[in-house]
Amino acid sequence: EFYNEFYVLDLILDRSEGEPKAAGVVAYELATGEIHVFTAKSVIFASGGFGKVFKTTSNAHTLTGDGMAIVYRKGLPLEDMEFYQFHPTGLAGLGVLLTEGARGEGGILRNVDGERFMERYAPTIKDLAPRDMVSRAMLQEVREGRGAGPHKDYVYLDLTHLPAAQIEEKLPDITEFARTYLGVDPVSELVPVFPTAHYAMGGIPTNIETEVLRNNTDVVPGLYAAGECACVSVHGSNRLGTNSLLDINVFGRRAGIAAAEYASTAEQPPLPEDAAGHVVSLVENL
């Protein structure tokens, strides 16, 4: 059974035998405001990243890092939280992503003077440089006063030298987004862009079986994490494009299998006397 519109606010850990063990979660029912306690032999966190802590992000409004925060409040560690990736070509001020395919098709980044500035930062690969290099270069242009717009806080993506048919056929999303959100036609106009917060490499530390680690070697029995909220350290400090899809497929599957296998043999841990007490206080103080 699926419980839609339930928002998990706390993790229940059993510490009756000393070391923590997953025992369930406490959730807030959005439709009624009721607090519910769910017992569980195994728990998987797949709560996504925390892009909404930044002013401009490609992330959904719900991605505020709550899963990571819940784990941290239970005294468990987080890992590599400083490793956050910015996608270079987000629509300025909005964060809506414009695919890197635009530069792959021949799109050029220009500053307010019309200069193809990536020639200075990456003379060989220019606009096809990795995300971190391009993002830093764009920020540097703005910091040094070569940004465009009323506040000089973005640069331009130039596709106007490409055939209109190529843009419409190969980059339909870009044309739609730019026209819809900015009223700009990429076929004939420069598109305002600036780096947008995109992906967290850090998060809840796990091993390759997605078991959550409470230190470098010991796991929390029954607790698993996968996806962007987890840090299994496969991306290092700078994820390569599309590797997040590979990550969630591989480790999402592993988490499901591992959690099911654990639950099939484990006993249900006892719940603390007032399992929902902290959450009730938290909600009442909002």
Where do the model's predicted regions map?
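Feature captures the FAD/FMN-dependent oxidoreductase FAD-binding
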Residues: 1-39, 167
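Glycine- and aromatic-enriched mobile tails/lids
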Residues: 14-15, 110-119, 123-128, 138, ...
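Alpha-helix capping and helix-loop boundary segments enriched in small/acidic/polar residues
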Residues: 31, 35, 51-62, 93-104, ...
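Short hydrophobic core segments
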Residues: 37-48, 71, 114, 223-225
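Glycine-rich loop(s) and the adjacent beta-strand/alpha-helix scaffold that form part
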Residues: 42-96, 149, 241-258
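An anion/pyrophosphate-binding glycine-rich loop and adjacent beta-alpha core
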Residues: 70, 76-192, 258-264
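FAD/FMN-dependent oxidoreductases across multiple families
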Residues: 177-221
